[in-house]
Amino acid sequence: MQGCEPPAQIHSQTYTGIPPETQPQNQTGTETHRKNHSLPARYARRLGLLAFDIETTGLNPATHVVTAACVFGEGAEETFLFKGESEADDARSRERFLALLDAAPRLCAFNGIRFDIPFLHTAWGVPAERVEGWVLKTFDVYEACKLGLNATFSLNRLLSANGLESKSGSGLHAITLAHSRQWDALGAYCMQDTRLTYLATLQDSIALPVLSHASKRQIVIDRTTRTLFRVW
């Protein structure tokens, strides 16, 4: 779910939206750089990468609740529904989902840094040190563009810019599905968001629905070089 600004600051370290180990650096030719690029770039990025997304009944984690959560990656695809019918079932699903976030070597999300992770921190009482670990290993195109370009956009606009399929609904639609207890449809919607975020993240060059002020040309996140943003 793409939401508003987080209700609280949950990490103190400077973050760009790109995990430190994958951020462009000034120096080149290091041993780490050579190891990371011994495999085709997209295949190497796929290893250990897990996309995640949540759906909620609203934007305020103090008064609203998580209704669905999904993860998607290489060999991983799970949907968790929080129906409020059994506290024991919800607790098991909650711990399973959080454990997957803990275990993943790398995470990706769309607006997960500003919405999903802070929401989980507050709504579920997840300790700050635990969520900080997720933040520091999350690739978040939305966050990178917010901090680096002072630009924001919807997931659908990002998907369109990269020639990927569009989402089937919106966050408001997900709220309606939860209120009407259409759990299968809600789970499918959340999984679609998660899968599309994963596919967008794997692009060698992630085209952004943002134009350069100087040249009015499209800006991309270049995953094949050590340049984060460049004009296409």
Language model features: what each stretch is:
Residues 53-55, 140, 193:
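Acidic active-site catalytic centers that drive phospho-/nucleotidyl reactions
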Residues 33-102, 106:
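Conserved RNase H-like, two-metal-ion catalytic cores of nucleic-acid enzymes
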Residues 79-154:
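Conserved DEDDh/DEDDy metal-dependent 3′-5′ exonuclease domain
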Residues 1-48:
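N-terminal accessory regions of nucleic-acid-interacting proteins
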Residues 61, 113, 148, 186-193:
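Aromatic-acidic/polar surface patches that form glycan- and anion
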Residues 60, 115-119, 198:
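Short catalytic/ligand-binding loop motif for oxyanion handling, primarily in non-cytosolic enzymes
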Residues 158, 163-222:
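Acidic, Mg2+-coordinating catalytic module of metal-dependent nucleases/exonucleases
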Residues 6-11, 23-25, 55, 66, ...:
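RecB-family 4Fe-4S metal-dependent nuclease core
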